[in-house]
Regions:
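Membrane-helix interfacial "entry" motifs
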Residues: 1, 5, 9, 74-78, ...
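Individual transmembrane alpha-helices with interfacial aromatic-anchor signatures
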Residues: 142-156
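Short helix-perturbing small/polar motifs within transmembrane alpha-helices
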Residues: 2, 11-22, 59, 81-129, ...
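Hydrophobic transmembrane alpha-helices
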Residues: 2-50, 54-55
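Interfacial aromatic-anchored transmembrane helix boundaries in multi-pass membrane proteins
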Residues: 22-38, 62-96, 132-133, 141
């Protein structure tokens, strides 16, 4: 695939919003599964990486909103915080992928993920302290809420998202980010086979 069209990106964004509804429902049986695994984060981050910043932002805002309206999760009082947090994840991951060109896909993916995760958590934490929590939000509460309690989810996202992205690219469902690198790899593989 040479390039994703606006229609392609819109369809993928809608799919990721749907996953924001479905994935949390699958974790209902696990106590505090939503907190531990942060299931909405995965499709939003993936949407930002694949479709770009505007679509990632839309996915991050609509995901919690649609999920809350359809399933009651997140609860209505917490929904605005999640909309900001996830919107930032989608926006930042898309921006980093747009402007960072290291020459290596894995480096770009992990840089985008880490910067988006940190940026989203820091900005949302500041907003919670200044606006949503009225000055009663502490550093320890921020660290516990955004890093400690959701550590399994962070690890899963850092493992799965690059794997999914690379798999989609290799299946020709996404444009190849570095065609020259892929061509070189194919050439070396061909040479190896010819020498057998």
């Amino acid at each position: 695939m040479k390039k994703l069209t606006v229609l392609n990106k819109s369809i993928l964004t809608a799919l990721c919003v749907a996953l924001c509804v479905v994935l949390p429902m699958t974790l209902h049986a696990i106590p505090k599964g939503g907190v531990l695994f942060s299931p909405m984060h995965l499709p939003v981050l993936l949407c930002g990486l694949v479709c770009g910043a505007p679509f990632g932002l839309v996915c991050g805002i609509l995901g919690p909103l649609v999920s809350s309206l359809l399933t009651g999760m997140p609860v209505f009082g917490y929904m605005p915080v999640m909309m900001i947090e996830l919107g930032l994840y989608g926006l930042i991951s898309g921006l980093v992928m747009q402007f960072l060109r290291s020459g290596k896909l894995v480096v770009d993916l992990y840089a985008a993920l880490v910067i988006a995760m940190l940026g989203g958590r820091v900005i949302t934490g500041i907003l919670r302290a200044l606006i949503f929590a009225g000055g009663s939000y502490s550093w320890s509460a921020w660290a516990a809420g955004y890093f400690v309690s959701c550590l399994p989810g962070i690890i899963i996202q850092l493992i799965l998202i690059p794997i999914i992205y690379v798999a989609l690219e290799r299946a020709h469902l996404l444009p190849v980010r570095y065609p020259a690198a892929v061509s070189y790899t194919h050439l070396r593989a061909h040479e190896t086979l010819m020498n057998l």
